[in-house]
């Protein structure tokens, strides 16, 4: 089984979880949660400007090191 990464926050998505969003041009985007999906598609937010995304990325970086 392949583990995908969230297109918004970069978190790992285990098999059977998350949201797969297919755009009209055929591009597949995978999101770990509804929060990431709505932030990216409905609100058009930039993940680099959100504190919770930066906190999650720091946590993941520490766990891999």
From Swiss-Prot:
Native organism: Pyrobaculum arsenaticum (strain DSM 13514 / JCM 11321 / PZ6)
Gene3D superfamilies in UniProt: Ribosomal protein L24e (2.30.170.20)
Gene: rpl24e
Subunit and interaction comment: Part of the 50S ribosomal subunit. Forms a cluster with proteins L3 and L14.
A biological-process GO annotation: translation
Cofactors named for this entry: Zn(2+)
InterPro entries in UniProt: L24e/L24_sf, Ribosomal_eL24, Ribosomal_eL24-rel_arc, Ribosomal_eL24-rel_N, Ribosomal_eL24_CS, TRASH_dom
Function: Binds to the 23S rRNA.
Alphabetically ordered keywords of this record: Metal-binding, Ribonucleoprotein, Ribosomal protein, RNA-binding, rRNA-binding, Zinc, Zinc-finger
Binding site for Zn(2+): 6, 9, 32, 36
Keyword hit for S-adenosyl-L-methionine: no
A GO CC term attached to the entry: ribonucleoprotein complex
Cofactor detail note: Binds 1 zinc ion per subunit.
Recorded superkingdom: Archaea
Similarity comment: Belongs to the eukaryotic ribosomal protein eL24 family.
Pfam families (UniProt xref): Ribosomal_L24e
Gene Ontology molecular function terms on file: rRNA binding; structural constituent of ribosome; zinc ion binding
SMART domains the record matches: TRASH
Protein name per its UniProtKB record: Large ribosomal subunit protein eL24
Zinc finger (C4-type): 6-36
């Amino acid at each position: 089984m392949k583990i995908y990464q969230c297109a918004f926050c970069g978190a790992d998505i285990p098999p059977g979880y998350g949201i797969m969003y297919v755009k009209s041009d055929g591009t597949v985007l995978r999101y770990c949660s509804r929060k990431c999906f709505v932030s990216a598609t409905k609100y058009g937010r930039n993940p680099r400007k959100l504190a919770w995304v930066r906190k999650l990325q720091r946590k993941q970086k520490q766990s891999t090191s």
